[in-house]
């Protein structure tokens, strides 16, 4: 009873009920802010151009209404416990008991106060049976052993050989597989999705089957698929990071938290497309639109599917396209000065005509200028990307620019053979098919970030998919890795494009998955390290980027604009970052019901963050892997490796698990059956 009183007292003392900030700006300030927001000048939206370096070093000082400082917020800044009397403790215990015995009636969804210290084991694990808690504790105990984790794949294969298939599958379902994976197929995962939803949490589905291939095979496939049949020509001005290097051909090197696809052939890419579409159907609630879907209403149109572009096409094409994008930026910088994306220079077609004036009446230059993407505020892109994503442009003919000295058209991409042009159109066709299916099924797509040598192409294509499909709501989301030095600038640029082309912008913010690999590759190939120097710098990048998104959302709300034109997922296992986001929302008057901010964590990790958020009415997601036991072993191996690297988080999760197991034993709840009455936002 002493332990129970202690837990109840702690929970009562530090609970924080979300209160929307009711303070309003004066009309004159709001009008001024609206004018500033709708201005398209260089200073109106904090787009990082020539002053990016100073902006990066000083944080978001221009938006101090968002937060009191640039350092991560501690729980103490959000929760100020008061002295709790014994009567309050008894009342809290009585309320807890009453909730368990008499949940809210149907039609009256339950909402709990949020403990932003994330120290409440009851809120964290009320969706779990006691057996599941014991399993989780044992899994984390194993993840705490470096030797076991280091050789986990070898041990799993050994167990498979010794036990045979049936016993091995039973063992895995009782341990790692049961903890980290929802089920074997889209039918067997339905109970897990329904239970998640009943406790306020929504799914991001991912079919997590991975090939278990050797390093030698991975390197062979990557080298073959990353070089054109015309050869790997490194012309003048080429950039080494966008060419394959055998030393880093196995893209799994030092990567534990992301899946890797290796290109085999076009048929494999077609199968991957079909798998992604099946994921969409699995999260769709509308059986009339998806007759093969499991019509349970388990996600009610709020589900998400994650995809990777490297699963849909030949990586060589993404490498070449990424190099084109970066060489285009360099071309523009050399011509007009400054740094950054083309649209950040705020140049017009007339400005370009002046630059090319010395070339005279040049037919090729005129044709080039006719194809430049621009609006009344200036140039957005030098190339017609809309034609590229609509599958009606030839890459070799598209990416040419006038030489300012000679007037001759200069290729920014080497001549692509017709067969590879067709492969690129196939990749774009597959992506269009997936996104169109998502739009028809009312399911969102999150395009995962990948290595920096692929990312310029991935982001460019994803933004064009947003422009094409995010006309009425955010269907397509891009992923931004905050361990990269350029993330703040890139997000600002993409937000500006979304505003100017009037489409809904969706972003998933993550810390990143490829840090060690990126650093080693940059050092080996001799290009600048793209990664932030410290953990703290990455945290600052995450918080500044999130703050800028929230600043723009606030301005849209103040101007009676549709604030849902910007949607952000805070995909983080970092408590300080989650607290920071909650505090920002509260301070500037963004409520969970506004549906512009959501939170996400992996299944089997940080339940003490996800479930309290969902039960308090925030939009909370779990990344839900599924697939046959023996085919998800590489995924399980990576989860074990990732948990080894976050021992501090494991320590807290183990402590909370043990606390809840003891509480249930003391209260005779060994056979507790989870039953929730929460409705996700």
Swiss-Prot record:
GO cellular component: mitochondrial matrix; mitochondrion
Gene designation: slgA
InterPro entries according to UniProt: FAD-linked_oxidoreductase-like, Proline_DH_dom, Proline_oxidase
Highest rank taxon of the organism: Eukaryota
Recorded phenotype for the gene knockout or disruption: Flies exhibit reduced proline oxidase activity which produces sluggish behavior.
Role this protein plays: Converts proline to delta-1-pyrroline-5-carboxylate. Involved in the conversion of proline to glutamate, which functions as a transmitter at neuromuscular junctions. Glutamate deficiency could possibly account for reduced motor activity.
Metabolic or biological pathway, per its Swiss-Prot or TrEMBL entry: Amino-acid degradation; L-proline degradation into L-glutamate; L-glutamate from L-proline: step 1/2
Requisite cofactors: FAD
GO biological processes: aggressive behavior; locomotory behavior; phototaxis; proline catabolic process; proline catabolic process to glutamate
Membership in a protein family: Belongs to the proline oxidase family.
Keywords: FAD, Flavoprotein, Mitochondrion, Oxidoreductase, Proline metabolism, Transit peptide
EC number: 1.5.5.2
Presence of the UniProt keyword Transmembrane in the record: no
Protein name per the record: Proline dehydrogenase 1, mitochondrial
Region named Disordered: 76-113, 216-239
Comp. bias intervals (Polar residues): 76-87
Chief location bin: mitochondrion
Biased composition (Basic and acidic residues): 88-99
SUPFAM superfamilies (UniProt xref): FAD-linked oxidoreductase
Catalytic activity: L-proline + a quinone = (S)-1-pyrroline-5-carboxylate + a quinol + H(+)
Any single Pfam family the record assigns to this protein: Pro_dh
């Amino acid at each position: 009873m002493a332990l129970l009183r202690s837990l109840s007292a702690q929970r009562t003392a530090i609970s924080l009920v979300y209160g929307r900030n009711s303070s309003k700006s004066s009309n004159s300030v709001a009008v001024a802010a609206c004018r500033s927001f709708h201005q398209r000048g260089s200073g109106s939206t904090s787009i990082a151009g020539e002053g990016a370096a100073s902006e990066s070093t000083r944080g978001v000082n221009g938006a101090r209404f968002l937060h009191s400082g640039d350092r991560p917020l501690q729980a103490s800044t959000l929760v100020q416990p008061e002295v709790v009397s014994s009567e309050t403790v008894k009342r809290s215990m009585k309320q807890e008991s009453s909730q368990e015995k008499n949940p809210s009636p149907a039609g009256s969804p339950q909402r709990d106060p949020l403990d932003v210290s994330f120290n409440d084991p009851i809120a964290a694990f009320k969706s779990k049976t006691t057996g599941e808690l014991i399993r989780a504790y044992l899994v984390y105990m194993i993840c705490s052993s470096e030797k076991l984790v280091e050789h986990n794949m070898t041990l799993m294969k050994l167990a498979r050989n010794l036990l045979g298939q049936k016993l091995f599958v039973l063992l895995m379902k009782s341990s790692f597989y049961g903890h980290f994976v929802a089920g074997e197929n889209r039918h067997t995962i339905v109970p897990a999705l329904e239970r998640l939803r009943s406790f306020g949490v929504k799914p991001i589905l991912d079919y997590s089957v991975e090939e278990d291939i050797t390093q030698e095979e991975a390197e062979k496939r990557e080298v073959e698929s990353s070089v054109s049949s015309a050869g790997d020509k490194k012309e003048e001005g080429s950039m080494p990071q966008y060419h394959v290097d055998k030393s880093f051909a196995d893209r799994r090197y030092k990567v534990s938290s992301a899946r890797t696809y290796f290109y085999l052939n076009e048929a494999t890419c077609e199968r991957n497309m079909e798998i992604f579409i099946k994921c969409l159907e699995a999260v769709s609630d509308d059986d009339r639109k998806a007759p093969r879907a499991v019509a349970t209403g388990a996600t009610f149109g709020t589900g998400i599917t994650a995809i990777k572009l490297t699963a849909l096409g030949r990586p060589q094409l993404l490498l070449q396209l990424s190099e084109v994008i970066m060489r285009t930026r360099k071309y523009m910088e050399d011509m007009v000065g400054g740094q950054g994306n083309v649209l950040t220079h705020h140049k017009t077609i007339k400005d370009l005509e002046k630059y090319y004036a010395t070339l005279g009446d040049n037919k090729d230059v005129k044709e080039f200028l006719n194809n430049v993407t621009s609006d009344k505020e200036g140039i957005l892109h030098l190339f017609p990307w809309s034609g590229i994503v609509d599958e009606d442009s030839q890459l070799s003919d598209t990416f040419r620019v006038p030489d300012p000295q000679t007037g001759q058209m200069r290729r920014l991409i080497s001549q692509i053979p017709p067969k590879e042009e067709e492969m690129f159109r196939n990749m774009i066709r597959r992506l269009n098919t997936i996104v169109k299916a998502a739009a028809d099924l009312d399911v969102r797509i999150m395009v995962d970030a990948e290595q920096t040598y692929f990312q310029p192409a991935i982001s460019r294509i994803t933004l064009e998919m947003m422009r094409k499909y995010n006309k009425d709501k955010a269907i397509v989301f891009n992923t931004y890795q905050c361990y990269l030095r350029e993330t703040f600038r890139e997000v600002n640029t993409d937000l500006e494009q979304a505003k100017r082309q009037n489409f809904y912008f969706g972003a998933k913010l993550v810390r990143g998955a490829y840090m060690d690999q990126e650093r080693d590759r940059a050092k080996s190939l001799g290009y600048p390290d793209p990664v932030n120097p410290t953990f703290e710098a990455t945290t600052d990048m995450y918080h500044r980027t999130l703050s800028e998104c929230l600043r723009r959302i606030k301005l849209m709300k103040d101007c009676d604009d549709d604030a849902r034109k910007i949607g952000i997922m805070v995909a983080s296992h970092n408590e300080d970052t989650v607290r920071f986001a909650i505090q920002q929302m509260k301070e500037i008057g963004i409520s969970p019901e506004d549906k512009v901010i959501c939170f996400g964590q992996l299944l089997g990790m940080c339940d003490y963050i996800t479930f309290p958020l969902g039960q308090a009415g925030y939009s909370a997601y779990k990344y839900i892997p599924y697939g046959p036991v023996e085919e998800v072993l590489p995924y399980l191996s990576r989860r074990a490796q990732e948990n080894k690297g976050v021992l501090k988080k494991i320590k807290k999760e183990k402590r909370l698990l043990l606390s809840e197991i003891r509480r249930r034993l003391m209260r005779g709840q060994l056979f507790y059956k989870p039953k929730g009455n929460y409705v996700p936002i």
